[in-house]
Amino acid sequence: MSNLGKSTGSRKDTKMRIRAFPMTMDEKYVNSIWDLLKNAIQEIQRKNNSGLSFEELYRNAYTMVLHKHGEKLYTGLREVVTEHLINKVREDVLNSLNNNFLQTLNQAWNDHQTAMVMIRDILMYMDRVYVQQNNVENVYNLGLIIFRDQVVRYGCIRDHLRQTLLDMIARERKGEVVDRGAIRNACQMLMILGLEGRSVYEEDFEAPFLEMSAEFFQMESQKFLAENSASVYIKKVEARINEEIERVMHCLDKSTEEPIVKVVERELISKHMKTIVEMENSGLVHMLKNGKTEDLACMYKLFSRVPNGLKTMCECMSLYLREQGKALVSEEGEGKNPVDYIQGLLDLKSRFDRFLQESFSNDRLFKQTIAGDFEYFLNLNSRSPEYLSLFIDDKLKKGVKGLTEQEVESILDKAMVLFRFMQEKDVFERYYKQHLARRLLTNKSVSDDSEKNMISKLKTECGCQFTSKLEGMFRDMSISNTTMDEFRQHLQTTGVSLGGVDLTVRVLTTGYWPTQSATPKCNIPPAPRHAFEIFRRFYLAKHSGRQLTLQHHMGSADLNATFYGPVKKEDGSEVGVGGAQVTGSNTRKHILQVSTFQMTILMLFNNRDKYTFEEIQQETDIPERELVRALQSLACGKPTQRVLTKEPKSKEIESGHMFTVNDQFTSKLHRVKIQTVAAKQGESDPERKETRQKVDDDRKHEIEAAIVRIMKSRKKMQHNVLVAEVTQQLKARFLPSPVVIKKRIEGLIEREYLARTPEDRKVYTYVA
């Protein structure tokens, strides 16, 4: 037991010692290993590597590094590679400068890469240990650096390589076939020699390539511009861009695509934008004039590539559009047809909407420019609101031929686009009210649904305040229909006779309808006057405290008319009559649809054959302006509506002119509508002035109401801020001028709604 214990204890005290591996090698032995490796490297460079044992070479390199001779190995490698590249490779490349240069260089590069891969495999342990510990380039990269510095960047080789590549690309641009593979290999070599950077490729090739390209494209642009139209030029530039992109893809490094495309864009587009756009007989205006949507789309696509390209296009388009618009809305020459006027604007809008969709990709800048231009020229003509209302009036009247409800709806939607551009929406509202009243009172609306649909569009655009009176007009019409049913029932019950007059009365609420403040006088003939008095008594008995005032200018009548005279041709021979009801050999009966004023004039001729202008004026008491218009319609209108004749036969109505019934009148129609002269041409100048005065009066109240609303809320405001807020609130209806707003502020100060602050007269306070 004791022996075992001693033995155990003895084993415990004993320590094993491993002798360290000797880290030193005989210098002679080291040199022999290096000579072996050096010879192997040289054989690899000479492509005589078939007899080499890579395993043995790897072990030798491993041994040198392990025994701290890595530096000798690394330095020796650098010297051997450098010597080979200088003495063999560089010489071969220099000898080929004038013969197969690029192929020789590419072959040398490929051989060098192959050799360095093999050498790297042999010296793998040095890469893992010595290179890491000493923070030096690995074997493969060392080979790249030496090749870069001693071959590729060697004086004349570097220059010759750059020039060769540039010459080949220049030749290809001119249409020659070149060795794209050689270019691609050279560019790839330059990229690899940058050691994961672009510096070598960029400095030795890309920078001079871009400079050379800029000069080439500069010359090309001058040639293209001199020889081609705008559309052909654009196509050539597009082709050039695609060609350069394709060349980068197949020959150069992909990173060159962006800079070379920018050079093309700068030299072929940016520097010549104005010239391209303004080319005579082929530029932007020519394309717009001739509806060249595809060419415009090409120009848009090309110009969208460069800064301010689309802005340049927009400015040119805007000048042309404004010129076209101003020509359409010019106030030169009276008698412009409102329907044609608005249709012309709608056609122009449709054209540019088509360009916007098909050519300009619905681009926001173009959209805003077109809208701004339409707003500009539409508001140049003060008649635009009236004409737009007349246009809508024309589309909502009965008898619009060739249009379906959907087509009318589409036209009205387009009209609403113009309405949005209109600054004086309150003026439009006033005219729309007049024209709607005329349609409703003469039963000319195509349908209540169409009318209400249009009002709904206006309501959506401007709010219920804008349309409340229009909706009130419809309510009045509905109530009037009920009232007339009750009146007819009353006549049946009481047996009261209207003396052969078929009377229809519309009772209108003063605030809703465009009634005139001073109702024009008119001596209504006894028969219709008697019929109306019966209705008046009936109505006031039901609604005590109300007043009924006849609005003669809004009324209409159907008259039974008989013409007795023969109808003659210009040679004096008599002709037969069609369309009229013939009761005797030459007697013809028609129903004449006329205004109240026209009815009053015509019924005078039941008493006498002839009347002078003064006599008619005295008998009817119609205001002179209305009387002249009515007589012009009856005696100077179309031959198929000329129921009176006048002496002398002129279009003007003046004192002393004599009027008689035109017994030779005939028409193919039994019912003859006597059009009011210039009714479709809008208001006369005096009427327009009167309307404008009413609008200005309404605006005063609206501006004051807005000022009071704002000041009541804010209590205290500086003048300019208040003016800006008032403008903002009212711009949906009209644009008040700062001068007018200032006058209304002063008016409110005088009436003590507002007051100026003592310390600053440009600051106002609200007086509760």
Swiss-Prot record:
GO annotation, biological process: cell migration; COPII vesicle coating; embryonic cleavage; endoplasmic reticulum to Golgi vesicle-mediated transport; integrin-mediated signaling pathway; mitotic metaphase chromosome alignment; negative regulation of Rho protein signal transduction; positive regulation of mitotic cell cycle phase transition
Alphabetical keyword list: Cell cycle, Cell division, ER-Golgi transport, Isopeptide bond, Mitosis, Nucleus, Transport, Ubl conjugation
Gene Ontology terms: cellular component: centrosome; Cul3-RING ubiquitin ligase complex; cytoplasm; mitotic spindle; nucleus; polar microtubule; spindle pole
PROSITE patterns: CULLIN_1 (PS01256), CULLIN_2 (PS50069)
PTMs per UniProt: Neddylated. Attachment of NEDD8 is required for the E3 ubiquitin-protein ligase activity of the SCF-like complex.
Basic and acidic residues biased stretches: 682-698
Region (Disordered): 677-698
Linked residues for Glycyl lysine isopeptide (Lys-Gly) (interchain with G-Cter in NEDD8): 712
Domain Cullin neddylation as annotated: residue spans: 698-760
SUPFAM superfamilies xref list: Cullin homology domain, Cullin repeat-like, Winged helix' DNA-binding domain
Subcellular location: Nucleus
Gene3D superfamilies named in the record: Cullin Repeats (1.20.1310.10), Cullin, Chain C, Domain 2 (3.30.230.130), Winged helix-like DNA-binding domain superfamily/Winged helix DNA-binding domain (1.10.10.10)
Example GO molecular function: ubiquitin protein ligase binding
Pathway: Protein modification; protein ubiquitination
Family: Belongs to the cullin family.
Function field: Probable core component of cullin-based SCF-like E3 ubiquitin-protein ligase complexes which mediate the ubiquitination and subsequent proteasomal degradation of target proteins. The E3 ubiquitin-protein ligase activity of the complex is dependent on the neddylation of the cullin subunit. Involved in ER-Golgi transport by regulating the size of COPII coats, thereby playing a key role in collagen export, which is required for embryonic stem (ES) cells division. May play a role in the regulation of mittotic entry via ubiquitination of aurka.
Protein name per its UniProtKB record: Cullin-3-A
Organism: Xenopus laevis
